[in-house]
Amino acid sequence: MKPVIALVGRPNVGKSTLFNRLTRSRDALVADLPGLTRDRHYGEGRTGERPYLVVDTGGFEPVAKDGILHEMARQTRQAVEESDIVVFIVDGRNGLAPQDKSIADYLRKVGRPIFLVVNKAEGMKYSTVAADFYELGLGDPRAISAAHGDGVTEMINEALEVAYAGQPEENDDEKAARGVKIAIVGRPNVGKSTLINALVGEERVIAFDMPGTTRDSIYVDFERGGKPYTLIDTAGLRRRGKVFEAIEKFSVVKTLQSISDANVVILLLDARQDISEQDAHIAGFVVEQGRALVVGVNKWDGLDPHVRERTKADLERKLKFLDFAKFHFISAAEKTGIGPLMRSVDDAYAAAMAKLPTPKLTRALIDAVEFQQPRRRGPVRPKLRYAHQGGQNPPIIVIHGNALDAITETYKRYLENRFRETFKLTGTPLRIEFRSSTNPYADKA
């Protein structure tokens, strides 16, 4: 599982600046899709081969008793409790504040590794910057500049060494034995535990493990139609005998960890409730992570035909950025629609892992350009020459040519749809990257 790093500190110490620096590489991968809802408090970072999740907790007032500050404090405490590492940020320019002491008092009790980070330290001597903060009792402060990047890489590498220590690595045989890893996500009371029980069946549970650490997730291995699958707990499930029950507390952090760990995500919605902002946030994170996706609309049984039509229209309008995914209208309680849902899981996984040969990709690109040329930008018309695959899960198609920075988002979507149609890539996000030739004589060759 990807470790979770919580950024904690009083308001205006630079948490959002550090968050943006740590996650910017991920943000750059995803174009703004129409209707896509993002929650800017959660993101993914990567240092070398080590990915991690980052939570920006907002301004933390640990003694707040009511109002929005109290709610922010509650959310921060939950994020800290579910994190692997806490980065406690203080302001090197303004020095030690009473709020810093209150936060430090709280953090010393949470039982997590704490990295005390003094931000805005650019141009200052370390001894001067650090002096005030030793009295917090959290070890040696680390001086950084989130705005300029000074010291950030060293600090995050040190944090990841601690976070990854002792995490077992699965080999290829172990991954194959697990089969397709599925995360069932959704807000409370949509029927996640009911669907899990319908999928797994009481006698089909091969293994159930609930480790004591917050980092580890519950894996439920099962077979369906002779194929191995692994369900990843996202709800915080409790086992009563042979039946799984949902714990009502909704954990954003665990949901994001499970999405990151999955091969395919089933986003479960409640047909009897409106699509919420929380639903859209979860869906947006699935897209940003590039995960294969199937949408299950639960509690479909017994709905009036007019309500069904209205629900379908609502889904199409509010989740239009999920147009690559299959929607299934099911009843987990009645076990209806589950077979087709699982077939779409298999199809989405196959699409996410598809191998796309360079000759076929290039042929599809040439056919698409012949059917519809990209628009000129001034005197320049982009020239698309060839394409190759740059990755899987999600599929990445790299297109080479000239003046490709003039390609519009509309034309990019057109190419995506052509590639999807040609290679039957349903159920997975698709990334398209453009690489222009830097040779000024390339057009004359």
From Swiss-Prot:
Every KH-like domain range: 354-438
GTP-binding listed as a keyword: yes
Alphabetical list of Gene3D superfamilies matching this protein: 3.30.300.20, P-loop containing nucleotide triphosphate hydrolases
UniProt keyword annotations, A-Z: GTP-binding, Nucleotide-binding, Repeat, Ribosome biogenesis
Keyword Metal-binding part of the UniProt annotation: no
InterPro entries, sorted: AAA+_ATPase, G_ENGA, GTP-bd, GTPase_Der, KH_dom-like, KH_dom-like_a/b, P-loop_NTPase, Small_GTP-bd
Example GO biological process: ribosome biogenesis
Cysteine pairings via disulfide bonds: none
SUPFAM superfamilies in UniProt: P-loop containing nucleoside triphosphate hydrolases
Pfam family, one: MMR_HSR1
GO molecular function: ATP hydrolysis activity; GTP binding; ribosome binding
PANTHER family to which the protein is assigned, alphabetical: GTPASE DER
Quaternary organization: Associates with the 50S ribosomal subunit.
NCBIfam families, sorted: GTPase_EngA (TIGR03594), small_GTP (TIGR00231)
Name of the protein this chain belongs to: GTPase Der
Organism of derivation: Paraburkholderia xenovorans (strain LB400)
Lineage: Bacteria, Pseudomonadati, Pseudomonadota, Betaproteobacteria, Burkholderiales
